Amino acid sequence: MNNKTIRKIFDLKNLSLGRNAWIWWFWLFFFKNPSNSQKPRQVAILWSAKNDANIKCNGIELGTKNPLKEDGSVHGGIAAWYFDGKKMHDNFLLSRVKINQIPLGLYTPYPDTKFQFKEDFFKITIKDKMKFKATLIKDKNKFITPWVKEHKYFGLGYDMTGINKLNLKATINGKKSNGTAYFQKVLLNAPAVPWYWGIFHFKHGAFLSYFNPHFLGKSLKKDVSFYDGKILHKFDNIKVKGTGNSLPTFHIKACNNEKTIDFLVKSYSKTTWNFRKKKFGFIPTTFDYRQYPAKITNFKFNNMKNGSTISEKDIGIGIGNAEHSTGILI
């Protein structure tokens, strides 16, 4: 990762948050479950700030008007959940915080959390209970290397920085484990609309992500990216069908002119961040951000041009996280 990208992740001095703009730093950690290898443990942590004094998450007020402060800090919120292998701890962290900047890093004093870059890895700590070391993977493929995306239209849109996979060493309550991690930083200057999203890491080195935001029945983006360990395959067409209620299965299909991909995303736990606010002080708006620790099964990839195929037997089961959000947050 070059120095420019690193500085972009942590830069608060040049940050501009217009009315209702939203910034967040989000980590997902996937690591071994000694009691059930088919259901890896997961932790998600989100540091965020939204220029909106009226927003609540799971009943807790997290919004702040003009969150950027003269001392370089940001007043916002922190949220985290933890699937311990058996049980989901929904509000593992959930409170208003002051986000302070340190060299190539951020920290909050209450609760005590830190996120900092050192040489070729990120160090993330949550109180004295959890420590994570997420190391960059040396690979020239653009799906693995850190990426930056920007999309703006008439001043509205988003600016993203992400890393689709890092190698992970985790220490939970003094016990060590290992796995993989995912990171994104997002500056959103537009309404939050419903979406399907997922990121998955496979046993034999493959990775997959999909993203399908939609509004009033119309898809705003259709994207599936699959890295088979050698080649990155892109699809700009996707169909998502969810079945089941509490722990759904998502059937996902995508295709392009030469290739098709088809797989199931089976969730094994669930948590939700429920965002609530009143527009103009009296019009209620809701946004339910559901997250599912999940695995990919029944994977099928077909290259119609050369006849090659890739199945679950070739790449193993994919472990990761699926999201399904509903509502709208203006």
Enumerate the predicted regions with their spans.
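Structured soluble/peripheral alpha/beta segments that form catalytic or ligand/cofactor-binding pockets
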Residues: 1-330
